[in-house]
Amino acid sequence: MSILPGCKDPSLSALKSKGYNVVQLPRADLRPTQLLVEKSKRLQRLGELLSVFDAAADGPPAPPVSADRPGPNIAGTQSADLDVDLGLSVLRGIISALGGSTLGVDAAFARAATVQFEFSSTLENNSELALIDRFLAASRVNPHARAVAEMLEQDQVYVVTSTLKAQRINVAAKDSNKQSLGLNLPVIQDAIGANVKIAAAAASGSTVSFEGAVPLVFGFQAVRLIFEQGRYRTMRLVDAGGVVAEAVRPDGAADGEPPCYLDVEAMLLDR
């Protein structure tokens, strides 16, 4: 899981090696076949396929999403050590997404100088590219979706094709001397409430696992849709690797798609 744009984070290489891009702040409600739109060099959620495209009466249905299945074995998915202020900001977002309370979290990590995150027991969902391609070729843009039609004509719309998620996230803390810091599990559990389970993920007590009822998506794959005169023409695969939304070039260079990065801060505005 990568948090900092532009930092050398080992998790980026691990996810990139499996063809995935990084969700900066993991979330539960990102899934395959959702549409994203590039706006001001950021990707924001646009809607579902059937919110924009009308399926042909004699054409293929909307592509299904696979059931949960074990994700790829990703070694080195630990994030870089984050300054405690930034790390706790991320942790509060994760705990909230898992269904817990964030009151008292800062006090539980009062002695920490840095925080590190790691995913465990990953799950994967996907929708077949061939089925997405067939559906788009046969369907039509809803005539009432005028703004979306303009976005499609400008090749600003993406389809999520695969997601990688985890129900358990490990958090480690270090003190100002970069030594592993023991964490008080009862204090943390009292702070976040019963909706999120915690347990020691290391014998030293310096790593705590947070587990909620709903897995959080931390990696994704997507394709960029290419339209011409209101009709779907083709799609372009989005290269894996990176976290900075500003790295997405809006012109879609002919020498291959650049890395595409999901900017979660922008997506949070859609809530």
Swiss-Prot record:
Gene Ontology CC: cytoplasm; plasma membrane
Domain of life where this protein originates: Bacteria
Modifications made to the protein after synthesis: Palmitoylation helps stabilize the inactive state; may self palmitoylate. Palmitoylation plays a significant role in pore formation.
Consequence of gene loss (knockout): When deleted from its operon, no longer protects E.coli against bacteriophages T4, T5 or T6.
Annotated S-S bridges: none
Entry's transmembrane regions: 74-90, 102-120, 168-185, 194-210
Alphabetically ordered keywords of this record: Antiviral defense, Cell inner membrane, Cell membrane, Cytoplasm, Lipoprotein, Membrane, Palmitate, Transmembrane, Transmembrane beta strand
Residues anchoring lipid (S-palmitoyl cysteine): C7
GO biological process, one term: defense response to virus
Protein family (similarity comment): Belongs to the bacterial gasdermin family.
Written domain comment of the UniProt record: The N-terminus has marked structural similarity to the mammalian gasdermin N-terminal domain. The C-terminal region wraps around the twisted beta sheet core, probably stabilizing the inactive state.
The protein's name: Gasdermin bGSDM
Organism: Lysobacter enzymogenes
